Amino acid sequence: MNLKNKKAICIMSGGMDSTLGAYMVKEMGYEIVALHFNYAQRTEAKELFCFKKICEALNVSNSYVLDLDFFSKIGASALTDKSIDIPINGLEEGVPITYVPFRNGIFLSIAAALAEKEEAVLIAIGVVQEDSSGYPDCKDSFITSMEQSINLGTKDETKIKIYMPLVHLSKSQIVEHALRLNVPLELTWSCYKDEEAACGVCDSCRLRLNGFRLANAKDPIEYM
């Protein structure tokens, strides 16, 4: 395929996974349209700051920041409801309280609308199934079904592929890939709790730190 002038919508949280995904898309030759969501998450300001810095590093000229504050009205997640404590005692069985109901389904639906507007042929999302916190909307089967639904519910001439390059990687493999591509991991943020220094004890911090440990690499961000 000739990728000249081919656009990809990259859903970017400011985290390590979605940032690596964007760098992989750039390496493939796509023009990146960066998409970030403020969804009333605890670390909203830090994630937005990181997103903007990463866009600068990628030389992205076309970006969107969309506010989805209705997530706080839905609640039911420790990420969007501050009355619910962020778990700090390690990963547990089942779906954790940090799961935001159907977040990725909503993100992908909005990304599809933007893809139609921008005439993009790819949506990139940094979901990780194997080494994640057990979120149901990070499954390969779910993302594949969303791709089918998006193509059924858009114009006939719209053909969108959802790219999920990390879905079957472990966190250590993600770190290794990111280091090979010179991804600026110092600009990324994973912590669920804090915005100054990462807490080091929430599920997301634990997964990130373990990934660096297994990859025999040093995490460049600051921890408490």
From Swiss-Prot:
> Where does the chain bind ATP?
M12, S13, G14, G15, M16, D17, S18, T19, L20, G21, A22
Any single Pfam family the record assigns to this protein: QueC
The organism's place on the tree of life at top rank: Bacteria
Query: What cofactor does this chain's UniProt record say it requires?
Result: Zn(2+)
Per the UniProt entry, the disulfide pairs are none
Check the record and name the SUPFAM superfamilies matching this protein: Adenine nucleotide alpha hydrolases-like
Catalytic activity from the UniProt record? 7-carboxy-7-deazaguanine + NH4(+) + ATP = 7-cyano-7-deazaguanine + ADP + phosphate + H2O + H(+)
Keywords, A to Z? Answer: ATP-binding, Ligase, Metal-binding, Nucleotide-binding, Queuosine biosynthesis, Zinc
* Residues that bind Zn(2+): C191, C199, C202, C205
Q: List, alphabetically, the Gene3D superfamilies matched.
A: HUPs (3.40.50.620)
Entry EC number(s): 6.3.4.20
Cofactor binding summary note: Binds 1 zinc ion per subunit.
* GO biological process annotation, one example: queuosine biosynthetic process
Q: In which pathway does it act?
A: Purine metabolism; 7-cyano-7-deazaguanine biosynthesis
Gene Ontology molecular function terms on file: ATP binding; ligase activity, forming carbon-nitrogen bonds; zinc ion binding
What does this chain do? Catalyzes the ATP-dependent conversion of 7-carboxy-7-deazaguanine (CDG) to 7-cyano-7-deazaguanine (preQ(0)).
Q: Which family does it belong to?
A: Belongs to the QueC family.
Q: Which PANTHER family match?
A: 7-CYANO-7-DEAZAGUANINE SYNTHASE (PTHR42914:SF1)
Q: Which NCBIfam families match?
A: 7-cyano-7-deazaguanine synthase QueC (TIGR00364)
The name on file for this protein is 7-cyano-7-deazaguanine synthase
